[in-house]
Amino acid sequence: MDHEGCQGQHPQQCCQWVSNAWSEFLDLLKNAETLDIVIMLLGYIAMHLTFVSLFLSMRKMGSKFWLGICTLFSSVFAFLFGLVVTTKLGVPISVILLSEGLPFLVVTIGFEKNIVLTRAVMSHAIEHRRIQAQNSKSGKRSPDGSTQNMIQYAVQAAIKEKGFEIIRDYAIEIVILVIGAASGVQGGLQQFCFLAAWTLFFDFILLFTFYTAILSIKLRSTVSSVMSICVWPLRMMASRRVAENVAKGDDELNRVRGDAPLFGRKSSSIPKFKVLMILGFIFVNIVNICSIPFRNPSSMSTIRTWASSLGGVIAPLSVDPFKVASNGLDAILPTAKSNNRPTLVTVLTPIKYELEYPSIHYALGSAASNPAYNDAFHHHFQGYGVGGRMVGGILKSLEDPVLSKWIVIALALSVALNGYLFNVARWGIKDPNVPEHNIDRNELARAREFNDTGSATLPLGEYVPPTPMRTQPSTPAITDDEAEGLHMTKARPANLPNRSNEELEKLLSENALREMTDEEVISLSMRGKIPGYALEKTLGDFTRAVKIRRSIIARNKAAADITHSLDRSKLPYENYNWERFFGACCENVIGYMPLPVGVAGPLVIDGQSYFIPMATTEGVLVASASRGCKAINSGGGAITVLTADGMTRGPCVAFETLERAGAAKLWLDSEAGQDMMKKAFNSTSRFARLQSMKTALAGTNLYIRFKTTTGDAMGMNMISKGVEHALSVMANDGGFDDMQIISVSGNYCTDKKAAALNWIDGRGKGVVAEAIIPGEVVRSVLKSDVDSLVELNVAKNLIGSAMAGSVGGFNAHAANIVAAIFLATGQDPAQVVESANCITIMKNLNGALQISVSMPSLEVGTLGGGTILEPQGAMLDILGVRGSHPTNPGDNARRLARIIGAAVLAGELSLCSALAAGHLVRAHMQHNRSAAPSRSTTPGSSHDARLTGHDQCPRALSVNNVDERRRYSEVKAIDE
């Protein structure tokens, strides 16, 4: 009976404590000022924003959940340790004090140290893996190539790099908090500073112990997962390249295997864990034995006295009686002064009255009247010293029903976490660099033959005629991050039973397409159950979706006679980050088109050197531009001037009568109309700013040409959004509700079409580039002279283009350079039509050649569109113009326009020089004609065979050899 009363006492005390805390909180809230409540609310909001910032920072480093939650656990443990030490030292800490101080402590201190340490560890791990990859490519075997050594290296290097900085920050913060604890300021500042100092101390310890261990485990788990994903499919596929590499390295692997231990590489994680457990058990027993002289409770009196004195120094009284009695003292003092007599006042400690139910006193009385259980419990463990009393206290606390449930939950979580950690340690035992079995050369040869002669599988119930076997295309290089772009198709058992159409449709309705084979998905798609455009969204695997779409197109009866070889064509589709394409750049994807990219230069533009990336299939184009760059650099480089920056959009609106259309035109041309439209347009974007509007009337149709800046984006979508809103404001607020919007784009822009309006009024960026080439450089590098170039430019670029009625085409080949740079940097290739508008002017300036190009409608951007793709973004990186400019939006796009203008200048200079010297045809015959043996991969007609046979006669070969030598010497002289 006594035992039950003891058990029932704890829940009542907990409920009473919660009730008291809630009532104190309500009293505090009622008596608090509005400003204090607002400050506390802002503090809590800032604290939660700090948590969000922590998870966002960890997400950028590759951890969506675990590192962030482990950081919070580490900080919570540090706070609990600090709270225990503070209360044991006699410093009173209330819930109100914690609720008021913790948000500001979290916001002030934050989790920057954990983020800094994590970033350093990850960067050193990536650096270590890159060094390993370089060594493996060069044939070197690194002695520290294992995952465990990589993690050890990353942690040690990170601590060496950032350890002093972290310790310094901790020391400064703890010193400041100690000063606050010793300041003597009342109101809870001393107690909270004391608690915060201990919390930071334990946070420092846990950062380099608990959190570092979790970080190492996370790194090991990530590396093990990546290795298992990459190694397992390669073993199953047994491709030709893997077979050759393994066969060539068989002797070396045997040598390594001979030096390795019998059971593979040893993983020291589990043995170390066992040793630490045994040492901990021994340490507990040693402490228990050493505590025998101190089993007398009186021997601890000194420590208790010191702790209580320290608590008395730091902790003031919980209630200040003079503050409570301030109202009474204020009333007594004037009375004493008026009566002119001394008054003695005694201030007593306030008494707090609480209303409780009588049942509480009955329960407390029954428990207090039967202390036999408590006395027996303490008497039983009294003779066992400090360790015995500690164990006794723990056993007694287990009798609390609430606490026991939490302990069971904690034990369950501990078991689950330990199981996960042991699995991670078990993964580390196997070394992925050492094969698990002997390599059978016969099996490798059979696998090679299988890969070389693999035939396509037929769809269900449909026959497709076989196609001639083609050579296996080379594997394209990985263009994006391997961790993001590598998608392996799930292996399918070869002996899987065929499912009926009803079963397949049932799986489709259950969204279980991942359980189907490729042939089953193809069958459903060809029967119209899965739309071909929705394969990526339906399958959830972009690479597999592209592969299946190729097979579907190859088997489509409408064009099977010409597309039957698509699924085995040399158009690559693997090892590409298709997520960037989806919903942004292309639909119905069947692969990607590798395009050669070269660089021309370096070219000095406005005092800075650039290498110009150019994606082209035209021979000698990059070489010609490089020769022009060399000549321009010899004259001091190119100078550019930006003359305009404004993208245009020309909508078409209509009215019922010409009178209304004319009134609308006059209103748009007026100052009031301009102001209203500009205000409406500018409200749609923080980058788009309307510069001007130009109107034209054709009958009852009114064309309005909006011209606006668009930041670093090319801006077509941005300006279209602004035009729609401005026209809506014009109809509703401008008094033209009878206006009918025919089209947002009325070809008055003019976009992707040759138009005199773009040539006259400009569109996009307007750029003029100039260079002065000394006469000696013209003769030595360009193999021409100044007067010949000036004469050729007038006759060809000026008079010749005028005779042809050209609009903006007064140049030699500006579109060549513009198109190549557009493809390399992710610009819109269709806008080469107006972007290549250019006039080239040459003059003889005191014996030197002065050349300039003027391009009034260059439409480029460094943000959005094709620039989101990693290869194109990499080309923008080498120009230093990727993305939006951090301080002045629009500068990156304007700099790209200057670079393109200077590159066009180099191309114009080189081509005109080649034309003047008569080198153009010979250079193209040398570099821009494919060799005859390239026809061997494509079946040709009998006519092609006759031509090929004629070209291979001994006489033709002898003549070609002489021509080749002569052309090579001439082109080499041109390039030099």
From Swiss-Prot:
This is 3-hydroxy-3-methylglutaryl-coenzyme A reductase. Residues 1-36, 86-90, 191-193, 294-401 are lumenal. Residues 928-941 have a biased composition (Polar residues). Keywords: Endoplasmic reticulum, Lipid biosynthesis, Lipid metabolism, Membrane, NADP, Oxidoreductase, Steroid biosynthesis, Steroid metabolism, Sterol biosynthesis, Sterol metabolism, Transmembrane, Transmembrane helix. It catalyses: (R)-mevalonate + 2 NADP(+) + CoA = (3S)-3-hydroxy-3-methylglutaryl-CoA + 2 NADPH + 2 H(+). PROSITE patterns: HMG_COA_REDUCTASE_1, HMG_COA_REDUCTASE_2, HMG_COA_REDUCTASE_3, HMG_COA_REDUCTASE_4, SSD. The lineage of its organism: Eukaryota, Fungi, Dikarya, Ascomycota, Pezizomycotina. One of its GO terms (molecular function) is hydroxymethylglutaryl-CoA reductase (NADPH) activity. It is found in: Endoplasmic reticulum membrane. Residues 36-217 form the SSD domain. InterPro entries: HMG_CoA_Rdtase (IPR002202), HMG_CoA_Rdtase_cat_sf (IPR023074), HMG_CoA_Rdtase_CS (IPR023076), HMG_CoA_Rdtase_eu_arc (IPR004554), HMG_CoA_Rdtase_N (IPR023282), HMG_CoA_Rdtase_NAD(P)-bd_sf (IPR009023), HMG_CoA_Rdtase_sub-bd_dom_sf (IPR009029), HMGCR/SNAP/NPC1-like_SSD (IPR053958). It comes from Fusarium fujikuroi (Bakanae and foot rot disease fungus).
